[in-house]
């Protein structure tokens, strides 16, 4: 009898162990689908992360279920730091067991998670990381925004055609892949327009978090360029422009999409009047019926006009849910395959088709600071 009991217990334990092994990496069916979000809620990029998350949360309220299951957002602060971004992505995958990830504002932060999502085979959709390297050779990273070769060309064309600029200086943040990359694409396009490789009279650098730009600005001032291109975080860029005006420089200063933040206006004050930058979307020129709905819902929820990053966050969430619905599954690989086939999805920021690199081909908006506000100038098609 004792031998029989021991044998039965051994069989039960063996079956339990086998069941445990079988469930590892393949959690049981749940009534909840978890989507991870890793955005900078603190640090140098906090304003961008906060705007993006507002759009994601609005989309989740608008569409809280898919395939008859509740969609739960798991939001982790990547603290505007590359190491923290990698840690956040790991946590979402290993601990929270998300089936897809949204993020991140800041190309460097997205790139920090690239190998992680690729190895784990959990798809990520970036809202606004514009550096081409984010999705390069990574079938599990997608984005709903344009990329920097286009953005740099848009601003080079503006400088050359609208401002009549024939010389330019570059002031870049060497710690940000976004800033260095976008500067390069501006230079490529601008020198092609001028036909003169010497039309870039200077390229000077600073580091994220710097507060004093007097050395860089003084060196540029002496060269008297027709325009300055200075893509960087909204905080440093606003300070840079303010100090340029304090030095008596009236050279037009252009930037990229990261300038679209309330803090750019509050830090820069009157000094940033006339600043021109490229971005992804404007509430002044809705492009689809979904844009209209998004703008109304955003205003109702937050009591303010929507911005480009909220719109992109909204679209990233909706694109993932569309992929889940088309896949008929919340399996990560199935979602990735459906994302790769996204074509003609109507979003708040426009019609979204993801190309062979996982990139969206989108128009760009050019805004100008006038009267302490961001004012729409024009839309540029790819």
Spans of features found by a protein language model:
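Short, low-complexity disordered leader/linker segments with a strong preference
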Residues: 1-34, 65-66, 380-382
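Beta-alpha junction/loop-to-helix N-cap segments that form part of ligand/metal-binding clefts
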Residues: 24-28, 32, 47-52, 62-135, ...
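Extracytoplasmic "Venus flytrap"
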Residues: 36-55, 63, 76-83, 105-106, ...
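Hydrophobic alpha-helical segments within soluble ligand-binding/sensing domains
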Residues: 85, 144-168, 180-182, 212-214, ...
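An alpha-beta-alpha
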Residues: 141-204, 227, 320
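Extracellular/periplasmic bilobed ligand-binding domains
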Residues: 184-280
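Extracellular/periplasmic periplasmic-binding protein-like sensory domains
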Residues: 241-314, 370, 374-381
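Segments of small-molecule ligand-sensing domains
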Residues: 300-307, 321-373
């Amino acid at each position: 009898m004792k031998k029989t009991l021991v044998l039965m217990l051994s069989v039960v334990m063996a079956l339990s162990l086998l069941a445990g092994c079988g469930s590892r990496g393949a959690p049981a069916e749940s009534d909840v689908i978890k989507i991870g979000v890793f955005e900078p809620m603190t640090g140098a990029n906090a304003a961008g992360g906060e705007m993006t998350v507002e759009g994601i949360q609005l989309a989740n309220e608008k569409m809280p279920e898919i395939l008859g299951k509740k969609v739960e957002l798991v939001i982790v602060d990547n603290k505007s730091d590359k190491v923290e971004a990698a840690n956040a992505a790991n946590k979402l995958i290993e601990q929270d067991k998300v089936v897809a990830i949204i993020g991140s504002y800041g190309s460097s932060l997205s790139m920090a998670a690239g190998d992680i999502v690729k190895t784990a085979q959990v798809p990520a959709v970036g809202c606004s990381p514009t550096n081409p390297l984010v999705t390069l050779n990574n079938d599990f990273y997608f984005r709903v925004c344009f990329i920097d070769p286009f953005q740099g060309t848009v601003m080079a064309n503006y400088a050359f055609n609208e401002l009549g600029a024939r010389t330019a200086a570059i002031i870049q943040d060497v710690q940000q892949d976004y800033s260095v990359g976008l500067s390069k694409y501006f230079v490529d396009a601008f020198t092609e327009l001028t036909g003169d490789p010497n039309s870039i009279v200077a390229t000077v650098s600073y580091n994220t978090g710097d507060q004093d730009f007097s050395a860089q600005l003084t060196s540029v001032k002496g060269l008297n360029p027709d325009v300055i291109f200075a893509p960087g975080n909204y905080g440093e860029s606003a300070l840079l422009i303010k100090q340029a005006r304090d030095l008596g420089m009236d050279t037009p200063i252009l930037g990229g999409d990261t300038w679209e933040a309330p803090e750019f206006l509050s830090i820069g004050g009157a000094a940033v009047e006339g600043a021109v930058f490229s971005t992804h979307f404007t509430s002044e020129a809705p492009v689809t019926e979904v844009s209209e709905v998004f703008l109304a819902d955003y205003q109702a929820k937050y009591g303010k006009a929507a911005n480009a990053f909220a719109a992109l966050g909204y679209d990233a969430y909706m694109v993932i849910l569309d992929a889940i619905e088309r896949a008929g599954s919340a399996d990560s690989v199935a979602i990735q395959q459906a994302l790769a086939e996204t074509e003609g999805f109507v979003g708040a920021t426009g019609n979204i088709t993801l190309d062979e690199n996982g990139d969206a081909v989108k128009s760009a908006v050019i805004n100008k600071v006038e009267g302490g506000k961001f004012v729409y100038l024009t839309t540029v098609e790819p």
